[in-house]
Every structure is written in structure tokens, then in C-alpha cells.
């Protein structure tokens, strides 16, 4: 069953990532304040990005990945700024020196 990763722009300007198997219904749920507390308190104004996946678990993995990103990196993804995405990537490899 196909699934989607999506990003909403909220009224405050914040980008909100999510995943669903029914993009149209999830959008309606967010707009009506029935999807989650975040969008109930800060309603969405636009669906700014969506990516289709073969399974819901793949879409959820993408959601988890993007939720860890900085606001600047999410903005780069939404705007299609691939150069900035690369520049904003942070290496978590400490060269094996952790704890030394």
C-alpha cells in the first residue's frame, strides 16, 4: 500500500513533518484540528512537500529522519536547495575519539 511523507507549513511558519497512507484525509484531519495537538494549536496553512513511498514504514523512517533536522535544513528541503542540504549536513562521526 502506498504511503506518503509530507511537510506542512503551520500558521506560525514552522515546518511540520508527518507520514500517512491517505494524504488527502490526513490534510483534512490537520486542518480540522483532529490530527494532533501541534496542528490543533498551530493550524497548517499549506502542504509544502510530499514524497511517495511503497510502504508506511518507509514513509515513517523518512519522517523520523527529517524530524531530527534543523529548521534551516527542512527549509532547504522544501525549497529544493540541494546545495544547502549538503552544506547543512552534520557529521556525527567523531573519528573514533569519543571517550579518549
List the predicted regions and their residue ranges:
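GIY-YIG nuclease catalytic motif and its immediate N-terminal context
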Residues: 1-50, 57-64, 82-100
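Short arginine-rich
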Residues: 37, 64-77
